[in-house]
Every structure is written in C-alpha cells, then in structure tokens.
Amino acid sequence: MPREIITLQVGQCGNQIGMEFWKQLCLEHGISKDGILEDFATQGGDRKDVFFYQADDQHYIPRALLIDLEPRVINGIQNGDYRNLYNHENIFVADHGGGAGNNWASGYHQGKGVEEEIMDMIDREADGSDSLEGFVLCHSIAGGTGSGMGSYLLETLNDRYSKKLVQTYSVFPNQMETSDVVVQPYNSLLTLKRLTLNADCVVVLDNTALGRIAVERLHLTNPTFAQTNSLVSTVMSASTTTLRYPGYMNNDLVGLLASLIPTPRCHFLMTGYTPLTVERQANVIRKTTVLDVMRRLLQTKNIMVSSYARNKEASQAKYISILNIIQGEVDPTQVHESLQRIRERKLVNFIEWGPASIQVALSKKSPYVQTAHRVSGLMLASHTSIRHLFSKCLSQYDKLRKKQAFLDNYRKFPMFADNDLSEFDESRDIIESLVDEYKACESPDYIKWGMEDPEQLMTGEGNASGVVDPKLAF
C-alpha cells in the first residue's frame, strides 16, 4: 500500500521549485502536461499514487497545494503549459495580492489570518489519502511568504498532524553577497527556529552552492533561476525515487529518514548529485561506475552546501550519516566492492559514537527518461559542518540587531507589539544551541552531551539529545 505524501509549495521560491519538481515527476512516470498517462507509459512497477491521485476520468492530479500571498508566480503556472495538471481548488492566493513585503512577521501574521482556509485544503487532501505518511514543504527561508507563512504552517501541521512526518526542502540565501532583502538575517533566524523545532527533516538547498555548481560543474556563465531550480528538482526527484520505484528497503519516508537522523534536532541534511549535465553536454558521454559515482559524491565540489561551511575547521568536521541513492542497472557486488575501497582509502570521516558506514539504496531509473549515463547517484548526508551555515546566519543577525536596524518593520505585527523582541532572542538561543549540538557531535562523548544541564533538555516542541523521535521509530 502506498504511503501518500502531500506537497505544500509556499511563496515565490517554493512554487518555482515545486513546479520544476512536478515537471520532472511527470516525465519520469510518463504523465502528460494535462495529467494523462502517455500511450508509451506501459511498463508499470512504479508508485504514482505516492505523489499523485486519479480523478474520475483517470487523469493524474498532484497531491499538492500551491500557496502564495502575491499572484505573479501562481498566475504564471495557471497560464502555463501545466495549467491543467493541478487541482485548482488547492491553489491559494491572498485576496489583496500584496505579498508579505519580504517580512517574516507579515507572512506569519497573514498565515494566521487564513489558517482555516488553508487547513481545509490540507484536511481535504489528507482525507483523500488511504495511508498518509507526511508532508513535504518547499520554501525559501529568506523572504516573507515562504519564511513567515511557511513557519506558521510548520507549527500548525505539527499541532494538527503530530504523528505525520514533515520534511522540508528549504532554500537558504546566498550569504556571500549583499542581498536585496535587507532583513534577510531576521527572516532566516525566525524560520530556522521553526525548522529546528517543527520539522522532522530539512534538506538544505544553499543558493551559494547551487550558483557555484551551475558555473563550475555545468559551465554556465550566468546561471538563471530556472537553471538552478532545475538542479533543485533533480535533487528532489532523486531523493524520492525509492518511494516511487520501491525496492526492499527505503520504500517509505520513515525508512528513508530513520537511518539518516539518529538524534531529533540534528535533522538538517546536505545533498550531492553526480553526474550533472545540461542539454548541450548530453553528447559528451563518459563511463560511470558505482565506485566513480560514490567517490564523486564525497567531493566538496559536488555538495550543494557552501564551500566556506564545508572547508571551515574541515579537519574536525565529521559525517553523522550518509545515504547514497544509486540509480541505474547496478550489480550489488559492485556496491560492496566500492564501499570496501572507500573504507580502505579512508575517504570518509565518521562520528565515533555511531555506525561508521555509508548506506546505499539501489533504485531503478525511469524507463521514459533517456540519460547519457548508465549510473547516477544522490547523496543525502548529515554532516557537522552544516553548523557553519547556521553560525553565519547568527553573525549576520547579530550585526543587524546590534544596530537595531529595520526592527520597526516587525513591531507593526502582534508578535512583536509593544517592543517585545523576545521571539528574536528565543530564536537566537535555539539556533545557538543547535550549533553547539552539531559541534558536540564531533566528540566521542556526545551521547552524554546536555545531560548534566537540565536547561538544555528540550521539552514540549523538541526532544533531548539521544532520544529517538517517535515518528522515526520503527
């Protein structure tokens, strides 16, 4: 029986990457732009109903909600090639259409105002599922709608569907360049608090690294948003491939995440993908082997998290867990030999308090999508260097807060009324504690970390270190 997943696309960025994801899924399952199964799609063996359901006339509809506070991106989808794919009852655009003005507080407050309408949509989708496993949220953490309204939805889902998994694909801003959004550090910090407390798994999509990969690996001089979004959709579709083409293991979300996330708060994952190609390179074919793919996945240049985070204090940084999803016709003995070679050459530095092994899931490729390579791979990994990404968010926040800059934008909303800025302080404490926990993971004594300090043991929304999240327990 399929375990269904409902996708929530929130804000401009969330809807853009969500749109690319559905395009990719339609290609892989042989579904047309109108949701009709193509005549050539006769092979079967795939689980379309994890992400799609069928209407009365048998055409496929995504289990997706498209949510935004301003209409531009959703209007583009409704007038585009895939306009007949979605259920139009599951599209929400705010009546005023004014957006959130890149202000987290505005997005959060407006989310509260339309909670009933959006939760009705979610409840309807959930009721239409036979065995709902969880939710996937696509959003950005830097703007207003994806961060603020996304945060409110995370809290609400955690409350309403407490036993269901919540995974996010969260786009982190380019922290190495000056942003158009001056309040980006505030928005990012407030969203990170919710991602820490209310999500079970966060796949970090770092704009800095996506841009670098597009330039260095795909040889694009000035990569467009469409091209970086295409990279994101590749990661999203590859990370769900074992759910859609099930094998013996990792064929549901809980199985996928349980092995990757040994402690509840360290649930931020980085990704790597190889080989990457663009259309004009498709005629350049090289030999791909399992060992070649698995070695490349460990190279910093293929990791979709900023190199400054990966390289800072690199000698101390360690992998907490790795899952490689290998797609293609692969002999399991090749996997075993590749793992042995990687172990012999000590290419991976694991934590000392957990199992020091790379897990591998083998998955079929879609028979309907022709690629130039025989084997491709996605790495999902928990790595302690991710803390430098959060530290950067903290330092950028501290600079703004020290100057008391732009806080009036937030004081207009109830959460920050009467100059009550405790939400900022609490968010900062939680993210600082998260950074400390990732640092502690590098120590062999991590299992004892926090036990002697009762204040660090989280209650209610979070869990203490070392406690297995009940949603991820078998």
From Swiss-Prot:
SMART domains: Tubulin, Tubulin_C. GTP binds at residues 142-148. Keywords: Cytoplasm, Cytoskeleton, GTP-binding, Microtubule, Nucleotide-binding, Nucleus. Its main location: cytoplasm. Induction: Up-regulated in galls upon nematode infection. The keyword Cytoplasm applies. Disruption phenotype: Alteration of the morphology of feeding site and failure of nematode life cycle completion. The keyword Nucleotide-binding applies. One of its GO terms (biological process) is cytoplasmic microtubule organization. One of its GO terms (molecular function) is GTP binding. It is found in: Cytoplasm, Cytoskeleton, Microtubule organizing center; Cytoplasm; Nucleus; Cytoplasm, Cell cortex. GO terms for cellular component: cell cortex; cytoplasm; gamma-tubulin complex; microtubule; mitochondrion; nucleus. InterPro entries: Gamma_tubulin, Tub_FtsZ_C, Tubulin, Tubulin/FtsZ-like_C, Tubulin/FtsZ_2-layer-sand-dom, Tubulin/FtsZ_GTPase_sf, Tubulin_C, Tubulin_CS. It holds the Pfam family Tubulin. Tubulin is the major constituent of microtubules. The gamma chain is found at microtubule organizing centers (MTOC) such as the spindle poles, suggesting that it is involved in the minus-end nucleation of microtubule assembly. Gamma-tubulin complex is essential for the control of microtubular network remodeling in the course of initiation and development of giant-feeding cells, and for the successful reproduction of nematodes (e.g. Meloidogyne spp.) in their plant hosts. Belongs to the tubulin family. Gamma-tubulin complex is composed of gamma-tubulin and GCP proteins. This is Tubulin gamma-1 chain. It comes from Arabidopsis thaliana (Mouse-ear cress).
